[in-house]
């Protein structure tokens, strides 16, 4: 069972629709009991770091996420804010993140030539190849909307990078844990292939 975690921070319906187009069923839930039965977890999100962590805590989801992801090694895909919440902390807020990836979330500091947020289509380069990036071509294009990005303490966790004045990490990977800065559900064939990889192989 694929569980899309609904904690009030994103358009979960569009992710469910993409998964259906690939040929799989997913549930949208914030019920810890249903999440405990899932074989794949997706943590989407748009909004602020502290609001995301607060909502997860108030819904009683942090303990079940720790059990599923850390103890049971259930594959997890964090999307946009969901990727940020996998880290230890964010410049955007004061609360601690889930800490699944040894990393921090920081705000873009760019020249006037580059607008914040980084919005629109951009290319990714693969730092490593693994199950999530399988059969994706070099310089695949994805859709981004973000003002913050992730800095990994361990460079081995960097899966993809993207150029926006400077190079930044656009996807992370550690064992059963994956995070993408872009929105697969808005990225057409590239997003569908990545989501299919996560569901079938990760």
From Swiss-Prot:
Q: Does the keyword Cytoplasm apply?
A: yes
Among InterPro entries, the record links this protein to: Class_I_gatase-like, GATASE, Imidazole-glycPsynth_HisH
**Catalytic activity annotated for this protein?**
5-[(5-phospho-1-deoxy-D-ribulos-1-ylimino)methylamino]-1-(5-phospho-beta-D-ribosyl)imidazole-4-carboxamide + L-glutamine = D-erythro-1-(imidazol-4-yl)glycerol 3-phosphate + 5-amino-1-(5-phospho-beta-D-ribosyl)imidazole-4-carboxamide + L-glutamate + H(+); L-glutamine + H2O = L-glutamate + NH4(+)
Q: Where is the active site?
A: 80, 183, 185
Keyword Methyltransferase applies: no
Q: What is its main location?
A: cytoplasm
Q: Name one Pfam family in it.
A: GATase
Q: What is its EC number?
A: 4.3.2.10, 3.5.1.2
Q: In which pathway does it act?
A: Amino-acid biosynthesis; L-histidine biosynthesis; L-histidine from 5-phospho-alpha-D-ribose 1-diphosphate: step 5/9
Q: Give the record's GO biological process terms.
A: L-histidine biosynthetic process
Q: What does this protein do?
A: IGPS catalyzes the conversion of PRFAR and glutamine to IGP, AICAR and glutamate. The HisH subunit provides the glutamine amidotransferase activity that produces the ammonia necessary to HisF for the synthesis of IGP and AICAR.
Q: Under which name does UniProt file this protein?
A: Imidazole glycerol phosphate synthase subunit HisH 2
Recorded source organism is: Methanococcus maripaludis (strain DSM 14266 / JCM 13030 / NBRC 101832 / S2 / LL)
Organism placement in taxonomy: Archaea, Methanobacteriati, Methanobacteriota, Methanomada group, Methanococci
């Amino acid at each position: 069972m694929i569980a899309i975690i609904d904690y009030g921070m994103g358009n979960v319906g569009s992710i469910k629709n993409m998964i259906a187009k690939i040929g799989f069923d997913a549930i949208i839930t914030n019920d810890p009991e249903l999440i405990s039965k899932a074989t794949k977890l997706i943590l989407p999100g748009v909004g602020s770091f502290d609001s995301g962590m607060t909502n997860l805590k108030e819904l009683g989801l942090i303990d079940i996420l720790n059990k599923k992801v850390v103890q049971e090694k259930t594959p997890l895909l964090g999307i946009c804010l969901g990727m940020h919440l996998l880290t230890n902390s964010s410049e955007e807020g004061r609360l601690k993140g889930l800490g699944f990836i040894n990393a921090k979330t920081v705000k873009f500091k760019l020249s006037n030539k580059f607008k914040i947020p980084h919005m629109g289509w951009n290319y990714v380069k693969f730092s490593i190849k693994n199950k999530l990036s399988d059969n994706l071509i070099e310089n695949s294009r994805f859709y981004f909307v973000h003002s913050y990005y992730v800095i990994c303490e361990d460079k081995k966790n960097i899966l993809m990078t993207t150029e926006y004045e400077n190079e930044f990490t656009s996807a992370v990977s550690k064992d059963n844990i994956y995070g993408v800065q872009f929105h697969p559900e808005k990225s057409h064939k590239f997003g569908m292939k990545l989501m299919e990889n996560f569901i079938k192989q990760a």
